[in-house]
Amino acid sequence: MPYANPAQRIGKWKGEILSRAIPVEVLQIAGVQKAMPKNVSNTVVYRRWVPYNADKTTGVTNGVIPESTNGSRLIADRTANETAAANIVTTMLAGGAAASLLTEGTTPTADTMVAQDVTVTLAQYGCLYSFTDVQSDLGEDDIEDALKTQVAERIALVRELELYSKVRAATNQYFVNGSAINTINTSLTLNVLRKVARGLANNHAKKQTAILAPSANIGTKPIEAAYLVFCHTDIEADLRNTTNFPGYTPVAEYGSRKPLHENEIGSIESFRFIASPELVPYANGGAAAATYTAFETSGGTGINVYPVVVTGQEAYGTVALRGSNAFDLSVIPVGTKDKSDPLGQKGYVGAKFYASSAVLNQQWMAVIFTGASKL
């Protein structure tokens, strides 16, 4: 009796685990990081002393270009704001210095310092995954280990997005055109960045980085002390457009080769750019996509609008619970029996952490709203 070849029992070869997208954290590097002790409170209060002759509400020094009442700086209002600022300076020079003159034998009136507080309340975040004994006992992959990695990456993403939600809502706003998000119809320009630099400098914002000197290597360039700029990866192509950004220097041409982050992409004038796919745009939030077809859209009626975050030192901060700066990982392996799972058929992997963030000084950072060119 002839025998046929037996069919394969499995007929599949176990390949390697494929790489996957890993969330990127970039915003943390520019923030003031504070660890709160346990068993104290869920609230942190940051305090600054308002400088002499400064606005007690905003902390802006007199003579500095003021913000508009709704928190948005309209580019069209620039001349009027500068004129107002110049008038304030004239008044300060005439009265401020004179007010500090002393009269012989007369005790001057004592001034008082004014505090400005920024309150941050910790929030608790977490995630939980489950798996079964069948997956653990019979599956060819280490499901528990894979879930641990997934949890760590998810927590990192949550932490980045929580911070991003705060900084992109900063009130010192610039628009590449128009005066609102839904009017955006063009890409980022060097002139808008220069306006931001001027505003930050007038508000005494300190730059985040020092000057980098060129090296002996061919083609390297010096890099100025700079504000940090965080943007979506879709913006990179516009930055490399030499027509709009003459003098843009990619990281490969840094003389001393000291990128601030693995996602740093380049610099121009007093800005260094760090790009991340997590810094998502307002999808379809801009002008009509059918009219402005040269710009990225998510398939809706409007073009995508990208917040570009520009920051000096101590503009925003993050708070974590001390001892839980990363996260508290929890693992319940399969086989753990209790009244809710008497046969120990389920396992769990999860994590929780406490964190929050806040803008500490609105005048030391800015958000530019822009479109991104299609390729």
Task: Explain the meaning of each model-derived region.
Residues 1-120, 365, 370:
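N-terminal "assembly arms/tails" that initiate or stabilize quaternary assembly
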Residues 2-30, 183-208, 226, 234-375:
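Sequence/fold signature of self-assembling virion shell proteins
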Residues 41, 124, 224, 344-346:
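Extracytoplasmic
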Residues 61, 65-103, 107, 173-186, ...:
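Surface-exposed intrinsically disordered loops and tails
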Residues 110-139, 318-324, 330:
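Short acidic, glycine/tyrosine-flanked loop/strand segments centered on an H-E-D-like triad
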Residues 123-125, 129-139, 143, 211-241:
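Structured, hydrophobic secondary-structure cores that serve as assembly/anchoring elements
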Residues 138-213:
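Alpha-helical scaffold segments that mediate packing/assembly in large oligomeric complexes
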